[in-house]
Amino acid sequence: METTTGRARYAFVSFLMLNDSYLPGALMVGYALRKQGTHADRVCLVTEDISTVARNALRRVFDYTVEVDTVYVPHKRRQERQDRPYMFTRMNVLRLGADGDLGFAYEKIVVLDADVLPFKHYDHLFTLSAPAGILNEHKSHFIEIDAEGQYVVPQDVEMTGTWKWHRLYDSVCPHGHRIPKTITDRVSTDPLNLGINGGLFVLEPSICEYRAIMEDVRRPETLEMVGDLFDWPEMQYLTLRWSGQWTNVDVRFAGLNGYPMLSVLYGTHFGGLKPWQFKREKAIRRWGRYPDFQVWFAEYTEMVSEVHPDLRKVRRLQRLLDDIHELNRHLGDEGLL
């Protein structure tokens, strides 16, 4: 994974943008990748809003912490999600290549959101043709749910490691294969179609592509899509922009909410409630007992208590550790653990 000059050819890239609230998640991405023994660099992009305390914490688990500009693309339904106009800030990852202006020369990067927890096999992602990502047309393709809204886990999943997503796509575009353009083009006629999941991308950085995207999203016809029709602007936009070029990534690399079971996953994606959002007390008491949250809690406790105890000097991180201990005591008393 190195060039002849000894510099890494590849990098995992995550983000901390706008404020420090996702700091625990970003730290866990870097820590989990380090535990896998990856030889790729670990890079965290931050915006100017991120505190010095948070940046210093990130340097404990990332090789590089790089400040980038915030990209603002107006969205008519910002009131539903305050971060919607800033989602294209993630496109700064395209500046990390040899032609970029951030001082790096990566040939390929794996882009991970801070709410993804990698488990294993993530270096394999660098072998895939870029762009690559997990086909995520609808949540119902990821998770099977019964009439009462409860998860339905296929009886043979522990043996096969596959479920509904694989039944839908394995015959057409299995892991590592090109996704037909007819599939990714569906986003253009169905705004509810999420396209390629933005929580995990495999990309080849190109500042020319970055500049082209920045120019394109200012065009009125593009702005109508990314500034109104799309709930996930940059994700659905990229699905269409690179339609016909995408390589499919197995959903096991970022199974949604620990579904169907952690033992068959290579990573999990915390959609909705995040394991560090203890201000949502009722929700965290409900979901905190489930295996995906418990694994995140255990890994976080290991990171701040054993491997990087200096992180406990950060008030936010110590408070989270205390909250985790208190929640687990409560769950234990209730017989839920």
Question: Would you name each region that the model predicts?
Answer:
Residues T52-A105:
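Active-site-proximal specificity loops/subdomain of glycosyltransferases
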Residues L112:
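Catalytic metal- and UDP-sugar-binding loop of GT-A-like glycosyltransferases, i.e.
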